[in-house]
Swiss-Prot record:
Pathway: Amino-acid biosynthesis; L-histidine biosynthesis; L-histidine from 5-phospho-alpha-D-ribose 1-diphosphate: step 3/9. The keyword Ribosomal protein does not apply. Mg(2+) binds at residues 78, 80, 82. The gene is hisI. GO terms for biological process: L-histidine biosynthetic process. It is found in: Cytoplasm. It catalyses: 1-(5-phospho-beta-D-ribosyl)-5'-AMP + H2O = 1-(5-phospho-beta-D-ribosyl)-5-[(5-phospho-beta-D-ribosylamino)methylideneamino]imidazole-4-carboxamide. This is Phosphoribosyl-AMP cyclohydrolase. Belongs to the PRA-CH family.
């Protein structure tokens, strides 16, 4: 085993890396958000998934205001080290639209189909 260092990840020109959140047990993809090296470190230290909000230019602890927290179970690095997978225990909906997942729209035969309503 090797000690993990967030600085070894491959960030984009803005110092960000995409992170996909996946529900523990089911494997359901919940959402994608951005992290920087500090939010990766905070996530690992606290066990609460912490993203970087590009619009607010601030840390975003998932569920801090909504109560829809993501408890980190496992953090995985892809083969190119330029994308993360956070396996989480999600409390409540993951999406800010109050849906279980952010990927609730399907494109089928050129048409958009909404797969789920808000909870």
């Amino acid at each position: 085993m090797t000690q993990f260092d967030p600085a070894t990840l491959r960030y984009d020109v803005n110092g960000l890396i995409p992170c996909i959140a996946q529900q523990e047990g089911t494997g359901e993809v919940l959402m994608m958000a951005w992290m920087n090296a500090d939010s990766v470190a905070r996530t690992l230290e606290s066990g609460r998934v912490t993203y970087w909000s590009r619009s607010r230019q601030a840390f975003w602890v998932k569920g801090e205001t909504s109560g829809h927290v993501q408890e980190l179970v496992d953090l995985r690095v892809d083969c190119d080290r330029d994308c993360l997978l956070a396996v989480v225990r999600q409390t409540g909906p993951a999406c800010h639209t109050n849906r279980r997942v952010c990927f609730y729209t399907s494109v089928t035969s050129g048409e958009e189909v909404e797969l789920m309503a808000p909870e």
